[in-house]
Amino acid sequence: MKEHSKDNMTSSRTPEAVTAATAVNPTDSARKLRELILSQSKRAGVGHIGSALSIADLIWTLYGYVLRIPTSETKDPDRDRFVLAKGHAALALYGSLFLKGYISEDELNTFCGEGSKLGVHPEHCLEW
């Protein structure tokens, strides 16, 4: 398995690192994620708000502190993968991707638009 430097990864995987990282400010980013979920759902006029809000803390913790996915190497075969089986929570996934820099605000604003990769339910073809 290819060795990754800490500089190009989202975070360390140790429980201590997760605890230390989340202790700094456990709710600020998750609150921003919730605000994105609500604003994107309102803007698009669709979305499963309850499902997305209920998983916001979990998805933000995974993307913010646990998953090792370099933003510049999304196709790296050795990176972590995330499968969202709770597809109705796609807005939480998309918001996390935006907050971590995987997608732009312009792309986030295409949510549920014609030709967008960001549908109400995530597709397996997304590279993040």
Predicted feature residues:
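N-terminal hydrophobic or amphipathic helices/low-complexity stretches enriched
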Residues: K2-K6, T10-L33
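A short, structure-level motif marking secondary-structure boundaries and short turns
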Residues: T22-A23, R43-A44, D78-R79
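N-terminal capping segment at the start of a domain
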Residues: A30-V46
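Cofactor-binding active-site loop characterized by glycine-rich and histidine/acidic residues
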Residues: Q40, L53-W128
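Alpha-helix N-cap/helix-initiation sites
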Residues: G47-A52
